[in-house]
């Protein structure tokens, strides 16, 4: 469960909309949510937070390092809490479902490729676009 101290630690004032949105992201079954997804979930929970507020708060959370924004091809921005460790993503081209995965071999090979070419890996983002086999 997220705490108000996380907002303060990120340099943000504790407000009811920020708390509600952070709690929604933390408790949601779906880890990657668009601003519209967050808004709909808040409405379904009976929370009175406007869509413009959701967009503004998510942007503030991103700037503060509380969430990570992903702009997967063919879709709008989705957000996930920044508390999870490194992982990569698969995005289903038919449904838009986002699946997280971590593969030590892929991570190792990426570092080798970079090193072989005389570079140091600073960061990376691997997204595989997939479709269920029929």
UniProtKB/Swiss-Prot annotation:
GO terms for biological process: negative regulation of DNA-templated transcription; negative regulation of siderophore biosynthetic process; siderophore biosynthetic process. Fur acts as a repressor, employing Fe(2+) as a cofactor to bind the operator of the iron transport operon. Involved in exotoxin A regulation, siderophore regulation and manganese susceptibility. NCBIfam families: PRK09462.1. Fe cation binds at residues 86, 88, 107, 124. Gene3D superfamilies: 3.30.1490.190, Winged helix-like DNA-binding domain superfamily/Winged helix DNA-binding domain. SUPFAM superfamilies: Winged helix' DNA-binding domain. GO terms for molecular function: DNA-binding transcription factor activity; DNA-binding transcription repressor activity; ferrous iron binding; transcription cis-regulatory region binding; zinc ion binding. Residues 84-134 are annotated as: Dimerization. Residues 1-83 are annotated as: DNA-binding. The gene is fur. Belongs to the Fur family. This is Ferric uptake regulation protein. The keyword NAD does not apply. One of its GO terms (cellular component) is protein-DNA complex. Keywords: Cytoplasm, DNA-binding, Iron, Metal-binding, Repressor, Transcription, Transcription regulation, Zinc. Zn(2+) binds at residues 32, 80, 89, 100.
């Amino acid at each position: 469960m997220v705490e108000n101290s996380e907002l303060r630690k990120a340099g943000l004032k504790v407000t009811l909309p920020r708390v509600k949105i952070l709690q929604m992201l933390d408790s949601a079954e779906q880890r990657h949510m668009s601003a519209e997804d967050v808004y709909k979930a808040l409405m379904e929970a009976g929370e009175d937070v406007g869509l413009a507020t959701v967009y503004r708060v998510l942007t503030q959370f991103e700037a503060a390092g509380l969430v990570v924004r992903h702009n997967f091809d063919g879709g709008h921005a989705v957000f996930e809490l920044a508390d999870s460790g490194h992982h990569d993503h698969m995005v289903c081209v038919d449904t838009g479902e986002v699946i997280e995965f971590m593969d030590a071999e892929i991570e190792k090979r990426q570092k080798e490729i970079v090193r072989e070419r005389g570079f140091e890996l600073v960061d990376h983002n691997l997204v595989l676009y997939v479709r269920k086999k029929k």
